[in-house]
Swiss-Prot record:
It is found in: Nucleus; Cytoplasm. GO terms for cellular component: cytosol; female germ cell nucleus; male germ cell nucleus; nucleus; tRNA (m7G46) methyltransferase complex; tRNA methyltransferase complex. The gene is wuho. It comes from Drosophila melanogaster (Fruit fly). Keywords: Cytoplasm, Developmental protein, Differentiation, Nucleus, Oogenesis, Repeat, Spermatogenesis, tRNA processing, WD repeat. It comes from the Eukaryota. This is tRNA (guanine-N(7)-)-methyltransferase non-catalytic subunit wuho.
Amino acid sequence: MCTTISFAEPEIVLGHGRRVLFVNPDDLQIFKEIELPPDLGLKGHTSQSQESCTAAAAASTATAASGQAPGGKEQQLANQPEEGGTSASASGLGCATSTSVQNVAYSPDGQLLAVTTSGKQKALLLYRSRPENARLLSARPLARASSALRFCSDSSSILVTDKTGDCYQYDCVEVEAPPRLLLGHLSVVYDILWSEDQQHIITCDRDDKIRVTNYPATFDIHSYCLGHREFVSGLALLTEQHIASASGDKTLRVWNYIQGKELLQHELPAPAVRLLVRQLEPEKVFQAAVLFYEHVDALGLYRLERSSDDTWSVTATQLVCAEAGSWSISNFTLTSDRIYITGAENERLSLRVYDIATGQPASSGVPEGWLKMVLDGLGANEEGAPPFIPEDLSVWFKKRFDNVSDYLERKKRRIEEQQQQKCG
């Protein structure tokens, strides 16, 4: 089971199990929620090619409940889709209680929310999320479980990558249009970017590669950013020509992705499995946050600065313990002053808040009982709730096999036996 957490001004979006919560980062109060219906109403799909499927999105129900919002508005249920969306009356593939939230992404204009699901019903759900209630626009089936989501800069379409390396484009205007297969990798894609001018799609995978693909002519690869020696777990767009990447090879790097040129390589204390970047000064100063794999410090905060001659440097480093070792950390997000971290404690979901300046647990502005309220909202405290065991990230690392040593040992024994026979 996955837990997703992200910050989209002015709210934290938290997905777990069958629910998505919208939380006010200031007082940690829930002011809106979405619950997946038992049946997503997928009619099934026909094959468009061996890699692609047409998505005939049909009936689905969206339950969106608004809590006590910051403005004090009452809760409301949003069970009906918007005009032009899908109806809630048709039947689909049947009840699939194991279906759960996989990935969540907000559109740049803040109007749309994309949710992918895993389990028996793999789907891309598109919601109209603002101004108040979340209303379902479409539910389109996915051939495989998703690995990453990314909206384009004008929110007109969304990219979905899956765990076999394929990348599909879904239209957010014609919400029932079938997907378009854009590109493919030979291994799982962990993150994806779409440049602001929509001229390039940037993907990273388990095979150490960062690929820059031209759009819309995605058969044409513009460049590669090569140098990582392990999986590339995260990407972040810095400027029109620069990206940051984090990898299991214990490095944080900055690239000119147009030229495929590495501009900075910074050593990390442990493999990196998540990367987030905040802009502090436009196109000049950034804060990169890295989640480590099995290290005494859970996160590293790095200040990236760009000089006038286009050189990059790390000018400040802060390591955040976040009580690593006492619980299994799975994900995190940042605001201007706090770090929000999700994980498992005794196989139960937990959420902790830390001060971004000190790295210590946040003390001010955290109401009593907030954690129980959030966990109740996600259904994590319900009777019969399944245990929460974060993804085993050890499978991300390459498996290296040494059959040369065995061969040399056998050869050595054979030579010794031949020499003994000659002497005998």
